[in-house]
């Protein structure tokens, strides 16, 4: 499998707990798709744990893993958000938000202690989650004349794309979705069908 059209994420919310010198770290791993979802979840958990000393987090979005952020929420710089993000990266995850809530136990942990604790808490949440691999899919839209229906359907049957849309008349229309790495072969086969022409649209990418 190629790396460019697959990515790993989690299926459902998962929690983990880590305790160090009476400080309690509650980690919540949440599947997200957009920055708006991230903001909504942060608002919910900041209200839920209003009495906590710190509510730190990190997130990663998109199959290319280019949209990310780490937040220390008042902890010394680089001691909370960065180790949380480090766990996301080491597990090669995306479309994920990890929030770690800290209840201070009265004993300071120091910079290195905080890094270890936030890293461990995030790791606990990830360990409790179900990780799945998904594919990045692309669409193709085309028209062809009805007499060539059998040729098209033979290709569809053999290449097994998802049929999103189809209409049959003298001029038939069809929209298919298939994993990105398999699109070149599908398109090349369709190009050989007499009368078939592709309808170019603004490119869209779908994370299945």
Per-range role (PLM):
Residues 1-78, 199-208:
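C-terminal regulatory domains involved in ligand/effector binding and gene-expression control
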Residues 28, 55-57, 95-99, 139-141:
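Structural motif
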Residues 80-128:
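Active-site beta-strand/loop microenvironment that shapes enzyme catalytic pockets
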Residues 131-146, 176:
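Short glycine-/aliphatic-rich beta-strand segments at the starts of folded cytosolic domains
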Residues 143-161:
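Short amphipathic alpha-helix segments
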Residues 152-158, 185-194:
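Short amphipathic alpha-helices in soluble, non-transmembrane regions
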Residues 163-167, 192-208:
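Conserved short beta-strand edge segments in small beta-sheet-based binding/regulatory domains
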Residues 176, 182-185:
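Terminal, non-globular segments
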């Amino acid at each position: 499998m190629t790396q460019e059209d697959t990515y790993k994420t989690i299926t459902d919310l998962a929690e983990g707990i880590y305790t160090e010198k009476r400080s309690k770290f509650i980690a919540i791993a949440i599947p997200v798709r957009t920055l708006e979802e991230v903001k909504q979840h942060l608002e919910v958990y900041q209200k839920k744990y209003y009495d906590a000393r710190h509510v730190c987090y990190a997130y990663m979005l998109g199959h290319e893993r280019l949209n990310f952020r780490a937040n220390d929420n008042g902890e010394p710089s680089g001691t909370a958000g960065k180790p949380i993000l480090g766990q996301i990266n080491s597990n090669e995850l995306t479309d994920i938000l990890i929030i770690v809530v800290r209840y201070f136990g009265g004993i300071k942990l120091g910079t290195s202690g905080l890094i270890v604790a936030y890293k461990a808490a995030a790791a606990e949440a990830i360990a409790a989650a179900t990780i799945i691999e998904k594919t990045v899919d692309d669409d193709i839209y085309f028209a062809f004349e009805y007499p060539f229906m059998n040729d098209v359907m033979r290709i569809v049957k053999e290449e097994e794309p998802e049929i999103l849309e189809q209409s049959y008349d003298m001029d038939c229309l069809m929209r298919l979705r298939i994993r990105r790495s398999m699109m070149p072969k599908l398109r090349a086969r369709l190009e050989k069908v007499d009368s078939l022409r592709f309808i170019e649209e603004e490119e869209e990418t779908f994370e299945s």
